[in-house]
Amino acid sequence: MTNEELSQLLEPAIADLGLELVGIEFSPNSGTSLLRVYIDEPERGITIDDCERASREISALLDVNDPVAGRYTLEVSSPGLERPLFTPAHFERFAGEQARINVNLPIDGRRRFQGRIEAVDAERVTIEQDGKPVQIAHANIAKARLVPDYAALGLAPAQPARPGAKAPAKRKRGIE
C-alpha cells in the first residue's frame, strides 16, 4: 500500500479525533519496518494524550485492514520544529520560512537545497537560495523539512569561545 493510500485510510479516523494528518513516512527494513505518522492540531499543538489516542485508533485500523506487509513499528508524533512538508498546502502555509529540500533528480547537478520558501503553485515550489530563485517540481521532492531559527526561538546553544581565548578566572574558595 502506498503512503497516499495509507493516508486515505487513516485520515478519517484522525479527523474524527479533531486532529489533522500531516503525513506518513514508511521506512522499510529487512527486520522491522517503521511506519511514522505525523499528526497536528494547528490551534493548540499536539499533546502526548493526542498521540496516544491517535495511536490506538491507527493500530485498530491497521489490524483490521492489514495494509503493511511484514513486521513494523508504529510511531505517532507531532511534526516538531523541523516539520516535514508533504503537500503543496504545507509549503503555502509556511511561505517565508526556511526549508531544506532533497530531490529525486538533480537540478543543476544538486540534490539538496536550502532556502526561504518564496512561491508555491500546483506544480512547483520556488525557494530563494543564495539570493537566486530555485524552482522545484513537487513530483521531484524526495523529502522536505522546515529549518527552524533556533536562535530566534531562544533555543540556540551558547556560542563557543574563540580558539586561544583565555578562560574566565576561577575564584578560589577556602578559609583565609
Which residue stretches match the model-derived regions?
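Short Lys/Arg-rich amphipathic alpha-helical segments
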Residues: 1-176
